[in-house]
Design a protein with these regions (language model features):
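A glycine/serine/threonine-rich, flexible loop-to-helix segment
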Residues: 207-209, 231, 242-267, 306-307
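Catalytic loop of short-chain dehydrogenase/reductase
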Residues: 149-151, 194-231, 243-244
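C-terminal substrate-recognition "lid" of short-chain dehydrogenase/reductases
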Residues: 138, 177, 186, 270-299, ...
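Substrate-binding pocket helix/loop in short-chain dehydrogenase/reductase
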Residues: 155-157, 161-166, 262
Length: 307
């Protein structure tokens, strides 16, 4: 990382896997950001586990690559992995450097190796290079988390340009394909691939027409690839979050007027926080999940998947 930048101040973390996290209730700010958005500028601040997550050595010795690891669910997974004993490489868009620096510092604060890999995954060569660089820097790979995503709300199919549609497809479908394919020679018996799907795969919203299609594809990706790789002992699973307070939502993922009450219609009456999703990724990455493959784990605040 560049030496001329100030290192972030790290908060202390409390004991317990998830110890009384401060979960803000609606209404939230309706402030929007340009894509791709930064967690550090959100109001209220999401809880990625910076203070609330403490591990129990469930991933000791493992090496993980997390795409979209600078903010949101990817950030929470990266923090949790490090606190569970894993070395972690994170990929992020170059415009998210400031968020990424905080995550790198948090990983290193746990005494784990941290690798920063900025790249736009819509470019095939860049996506494949991220995998190669992670394997080289970490000395191998046991866990691949395909989490980076693009979500842009649109009132009508007529409002989605071909370029915008292509950007969503490239980010959410092509990039996981390229990266899983590139990682396969490095993944051995016991390895785990985790892809972030969404409740949108089961119950698509009208304003997320293109995003919902890709999340259904992500679910199918996990189910089909799990069958392919089962003979090699490599597990593949998906996670389907419901409404979670991340930079994805404030950078075009939701309309401005929907942000104050985002997630308030869930039975729990609020959106999820990224730290509340991270334990699913820890489980699926761990040896505890040795008989779990081809599954899609939902966390929707009680709304369910309807599937």
């Amino acid at each position: 990382m560049a030496d001329d930048k100030t290192d972030p101040v790290l908060p202390p973390h409390r004991s317990g896997a998830i110890s009384d996290p401060d979960l803000p209730l609606n209404p939230y700010s309706d402030d929007q950001q340009p894509w791709p958005g930064l967690a550090e500028k959100m109001d209220p601040q999401p809880d990625h586990g910076e203070q609330s997550y403490k591990g129990r050595d469930r991933l000791t010795g493992k090496r993980a690559l997390v795409t979209g690891g600078d903010s949101g669910i990817g950030r929470a997974a990266a923090i949790a992995f490090a606190r569970e004993g894993a070395d972690v490489a994170i990929n992020y868009h170059p415009d998210e450097e400031s968020d990424a620096r905080t995550v790198i510092a948090l990983i290193e604060a746990e005494g784990r190796k941290a690798v920063a890999l900025p790249a736009d995954l819509r470019d095939e060569a860049a996506a494949r290079k991220v995998v190669d660089d992670a394997v080289k820097a970490l000395g191998g790979l046991e866990v691949l988390v395909l989490n980076a995503g693009r979500q842009q709300a649109a009132k009508s199919i007529e409002d989605i340009t071909s370029d915008a549609f292509d950007a969503t497809i490239k980010t959410n479908i092509y990039a996981p394909f390229w990266m899983a394919q590139q990682a396969l020679p490095s993944l051995k018996n016991g390895a785990s691939i985790i892809i972030t799907s969404s409740v949108q795969a089961f119950s698509p919203s009208a304003h997320l027409f293109d995003y919902a299609q890709t999340k259904a594809a992500n679910r199918a990706f996990a189910q089909a690839l799990a069958k392919q790789l089962a003979p090699k002992g490599i597990r593949v699973n998906a996670v389907a979050p419901g409404p979670v307070w991340t930079a994805l939502q404030v950078s075009g993922g939701q309309f401005k007027d929907k942000l104050p009450e985002f997630g308030a219609d869930s039975p729990l009456g609020r959106p999820g926080q990224p730290v509340e999703i991270a334990p699913i990724y820890v489980l699926l990455a761990s040896d505890e999940a040795s008989y779990i493959t081809g599954e899609c784990y939902a966390a929707t605040g009680g709304s369910g998947t309807g599937g």
